[in-house]
Amino acid sequence: MIRKYIIGVVALLATLVLPALAIDHKGITSDQLDKNSFTLMQNGKPTPILMDVTDERGISIAVENLAEDFRRVGGTRAEVLATPRVSRFVLIGSLQSRYIRQLIKDQKLDVSILKGKSEQYLITTVNRPFANVDEVLVVVGSDRRGAIYGTYELSEQIGVSPWYWWADVPVVRQQNLAIERGNYTAGEPAVKYRGLFLN
């Protein structure tokens, strides 16, 4: 009896919380690789991910999860880089990341939409961001949580639901994935703390 009650409560909470965890930007990823998109994965091989190792610890955990999510989708784990040593990659960080700060200083990344904001992120592309680098997909957060939310938004975009562990939501397997170039953001939360709390 108690078990049925607990299952019922969790199911009710799921119906209330799932909309809050829904993907922010529908229809911006596809399996078509073309000049209007940034390639995230080709023939099962994901684009590497770069982060500043001195950035917030929580961001590095989200990055590792994203790298593993690429394995769930295409079969190969994304390489996590500490330095920009390849020509194309995904760059993830907060406004405190040295790589993000360098892009801002060089006027290659406009983060004005994030200034003074809480838990907000921006996903965009930058051409020729660093020496010997052609293009990067940037996931930048106004703070630690913003960067983390942006990272998990990217996980959703590649086909891994935030309910993968909770509700056995199946992963959509792909060999090719690209994200349409553009500026994607999500606003500040309507409440101070967001998430699923079970007491």
Residue ranges and their predicted role:
Residues 2, 12-13, 18-128, 181-184:
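Acidic, contiguous N-terminal accessory segments
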Residues 62-65, 69-71, 107-199:
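Feature activates predominantly on carbohydrate-active enzymes
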